[in-house]
Regions:
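Non-catalytic DNA-recognition/assembly elements of restriction-modification systems
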Residues: 12-34, 218-235
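Long compositionally biased, domain-poor regions of proteins
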Residues: 59, 98-99, 120, 135-145, ...
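Coiled-coil heptad-register positions
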Residues: 190, 194, 201-208, 215
Length: 235
């Protein structure tokens, strides 16, 4: 059975399965990270990841997030809370709040106070299921003043989440994982084709042979008739 057939069958199962909508705060702990240490000495020879809004922004959306630049040392982590892997992060203050960044940690990390943190109740909801659902929620609906964007943890906790049985959640996750894998493959292929296009575009239009080995090398002596004109002369 192909992935589309499985998806259709799953939709039929969901329609008959008992689904209860619950506030996020009832099925997960919704909180925020720690204030960032200001002393640069706390980051010297650091080994403990400290996730900032900028880290999340660089990735934008990822269910396998680990790309964290700053690392704290033993002194820097004193008094800070460590967040478990599978914690979902999203910006809660600043302009990036409007961009719907969403990631899920794959490593235990310390987290900036500018990020909201969501860690699910393992007995009620699967981490990936919760991430996939939250990924299609537009947090702009919770921001009253777009000129001063901010999200309150209390408002995030009110987001309603559909909770089917764990067995159904697992099947949903399995299919969405397949689509995510397919999307990543297509994006990689598209990036490759884009690089190929750029290479051949530059090769074919390089009349001055600035990149070396371009069209000028292949047609030596035949490009003397090429005339350079201003754009205004030809358009």
């Amino acid at each position: 059975m192909d992935i589309q057939s499985k998806a259709k069958k799953l939709i039929e199962m969901i329609q008959t399965a008992p689904v209860e909508w619950k506030p996020l705060g009832e099925i997960a702990e919704v909180s925020a990270g720690n204030s960032a240490p200001q002393n640069s000495a706390f980051f010297e020879n650091g080994i403990y990841p400290f996730c900032r809004t900028s880290d999340v922004g660089r990735v934008h959306h990822s269910i396998n997030f680990y790309q964290i630049q700053d690392k704290l040392n033993d002194i820097g982590i004193k008094g800070l809370r460590l967040f478990k892997k599978e914690t979902i992060l999203l910006p809660k203050s600043g302009a990036s709040t409007l961009l719907n960044h969403r990631v899920m940690l794959t490593i235990d990390s310390y987290v900036s106070s500018h990020l909201a943190t969501i860690y699910r109740n393992e007995k009620i909801v699967l981490a990936k299921y919760l991430f996939y659902f939250l990924s299609q929620f537009d947090v702009n609906e919770l921001i009253p003043d777009k000129s001063y964007p901010s999200l309150k943890v209390t408002e995030i906790a009110k987001i309603k989440i559909p909770i089917p049985p764990l067995e159904i959640q697992q099947k949903i996750v399995k299919i969405l994982d397949k689509f995510t894998e397919l999307e990543a493959t297509l994006e990689a292929e598209l990036a490759l084709r884009k690089r190929q296009y750029q290479y051949y575009r530059d090769f074919l239009l390089d009349f001055n042979n600035r990149i070396g080995g371009g069209i000028a090398d292949n047609y030596k002596g035949r490009l003397k008739d090429v005339v350079w004109k201003t754009l205004g002369e030809v358009a």
